[in-house]
From Swiss-Prot:
Catalyzes the conversion of 4-hydroxy-tetrahydrodipicolinate (HTPA) to tetrahydrodipicolinate. It catalyses: (S)-2,3,4,5-tetrahydrodipicolinate + NAD(+) + H2O = (2S,4S)-4-hydroxy-2,3,4,5-tetrahydrodipicolinate + NADH + H(+); (S)-2,3,4,5-tetrahydrodipicolinate + NADP(+) + H2O = (2S,4S)-4-hydroxy-2,3,4,5-tetrahydrodipicolinate + NADPH + H(+). Signal peptide: none annotated. This is 4-hydroxy-tetrahydrodipicolinate reductase. Keywords: Amino-acid biosynthesis, Cytoplasm, Diaminopimelate biosynthesis, Lysine biosynthesis, NAD, NADP, Oxidoreductase, Plasmid. GO terms for molecular function: 4-hydroxy-tetrahydrodipicolinate reductase. InterPro entries: DapB_C, DapB_N, DapB_N_CS, DHDPR_bac, NAD(P)-bd_dom_sf. Pathway: Amino-acid biosynthesis; L-lysine biosynthesis via DAP pathway; (S)-tetrahydrodipicolinate from L-aspartate: step 4/4. One of its GO terms (biological process) is diaminopimelate biosynthetic process. The gene is dapB. NCBIfam families: dapB. Disulfide bonds: none annotated.
């Protein structure tokens, strides 16, 4: 069986380097292209060297069109604006678009929806199996408990994290809202400061923290005299590339 040819965009980033390593270790796929933004110091370098490995014979390019044309799929953990552009380009050439980019707004998601009409698009706020299992558990618990139980989504990430709440936190919040048969945006509360008054029944709170960890997430269901906590701890960034 032939190997799946994959392009990694944002190749010099944390997840980009992790993905390049993961592809090298998977016999079912091969790195056919590596893309970085124009002006990046990584452009022209061997993608293997960029990822901290031996040479792989694939040079990092700033021309995604040519890289996509020779691929079966693109792995994308970049920025919302870049992801929107890559999605349109992937649709043009007819390849799979796997999206782990976080911090996207409706305008960005609309581009993914449009692309999904013609190509397979896989998108998640977090690609780890553990977080997605946690989301399923959160949905079930939220469905069982009544609205008198307060829900808080707590998280900690490395200090270079640029979006908050994270995609994983929003995924968990959406799972809690789904369990309560409601919409997250109608009950979302991010951060509290000053005199806020009593908590509104049914709200779902978010409290992001800085640190040096890959990603810790905890969902707390706080009731009268009892508390239920469900959590997931990411110990290695490579789990997002599995």
């Amino acid at each position: 069986m032939s190997q799946m040819r994959l392009v990694v965009v944002g190749a010099a980033g944390r997840m980009g380097r992790t993905l390049i390593k993961a592809i090298a270790e998977n016999p079912g796929c091969m790195l056919s292209g590596a893309v970085e933004r124009p002006g990046s110091a990584a452009v022209g370098q061997d993608a293997g060297f960029v990822a901290g490995m031996a040479s792989c014979g694939v040079l990092v390019t700033d021309e995604p069109g040519s890289a996509f044309a020779e691929a079966d799929g693109v792995l994308d953990f970049t920025t919302p604006d870049a992801t929107a552009e890559y999605s349109s380009l992937a649709a043009q050439v007819g390849i799979v678009h796997v999206v782990g980019t976080t911090g996207m707004e409706p305008v960005h998601f609309s581009k993914l929806v449009r692309a999904a009409r013609t190509i397979p698009v896989v998108q998640s706020g977090n690609m780890s199996l553990g977080v997605n299992i946690l989301a399923a558990l959160v949905q079930k618990v939220a469905a069982i408990l009544d609205k008198e139980w307060d829900i808080e989504v707590l998280e900690m990430h490395h200090r270079m994290k640029v979006d908050a709440p994270s995609g994983a936190a929003l995924l968990l919040g959406e799972a809690a809202a789904s369990g309560r048969q409601t919409i997250l945006s109608d009950h979302y509360v991010a951060g509290r400061d000053g005199y806020t008054g009593c908590r509104t029944v049914g709200t779902i709170g978010f409290a992001p923290c800085a640190g040096x960890v890959v990603g810790d997430h905890k969902v707390v269901f706080a009731g009268a005299g009892x508390r239920i906590e469900l959590s997931h701890i990411a110990e290695d960034r490579s789990l997002f590339a599995q």
